[in-house]
């Protein structure tokens, strides 16, 4: 569930009570798993080494079946098609509003496609798709893109990145622990906001080369294996067998 951003932040008032609950659960023998290294590190720094294990997110089997049906798109026609995806496009924590407006200001150099509710972005070079609940339609639309731009500062191990990368769509992500961790798994890197504005004007193969240091075909093959749901399943099975 994606909750709207709160107007009053009460989190700091609740932290002590929640940490006590975690300590009580650990005393009962509860085991904790995080999909990301940076969250596990933060947890272990509070509650002790090895208290939280890591199993990265992967593509679920239903999505795997959808991805298998999508033909790889090596070259797109016309100007670069750039996707921005979020549940609520107004929320600056998930979508850097200023960065999107700077991309819009590139005019006819790019075609910006937004997927999500309440898009505040309107311009001649913007196509608003709305919130797409059908995973097959969303993946099919993303498959036609040259890149996905990801600027969230509040994610853990974002599944949309795994999904886009799995179908061979390069991800141009601004610096964050979450994006860095996901991209590293397929040999990619995060970039500055200034670099985003340069990269979105390139072709799909050029973006793959710049972010992943390899050809589009090699990047696609590497990513397909890196975010496999089968790998995630095997890690969970192994975890439960060793309890």
Regions flagged by a language model, labelled:
Residues 153:
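Aromatic "clamp/platform" in nucleotide-sugar-dependent glycosyltransferases that forms part
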């Amino acid at each position: 569930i994606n909750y709207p951003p709160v107007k009053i932040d009460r989190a700091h008032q609740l932290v002590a009570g929640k940490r006590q609950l975690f300590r009580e659960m650990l005393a009962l023998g509860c085991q904790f798993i995080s999909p990301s290294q940076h969250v596990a590190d933060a947890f272990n720094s509070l509650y002790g080494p090895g208290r939280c294990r890591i199993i990265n997110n992967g593509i679920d089997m239903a999505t795997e079946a959808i991805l298998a049906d999508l033909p790889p798109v090596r070259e797109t026609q016309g100007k670069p098609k750039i996707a921005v995806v979020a549940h609520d496009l107004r929320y600056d924590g998930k979508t850097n509003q200023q960065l999107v407006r700077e991309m819009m200001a590139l005019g006819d150099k790019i075609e910006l496609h937004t997927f999500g509710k309440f898009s505040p972005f309107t311009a001649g070079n913007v196509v608003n798709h709305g919130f797409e609940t059908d995973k097959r339609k969303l993946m099919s639309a993303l498959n036609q893109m040259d890149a996905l731009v990801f600027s969230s500062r509040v994610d853990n191990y974002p599944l949309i990145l795994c999904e886009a990368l799995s179908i061979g769509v390069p991800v141009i992500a601004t610096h964050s622990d979450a994006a860095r961790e996901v991209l590293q798994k397929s040999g990619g890197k995060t970039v500055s906001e200034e670099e985003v504005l340069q990269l979105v004007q390139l072709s799909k193969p050029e973006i793959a080369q710049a972010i992943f240091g390899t050809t589009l075909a090699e990047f696609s093959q590497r990513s397909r294996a890196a975010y496999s749901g089968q790998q995630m399943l095997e890690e969970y099975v192994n975890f439960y067998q060793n309890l």
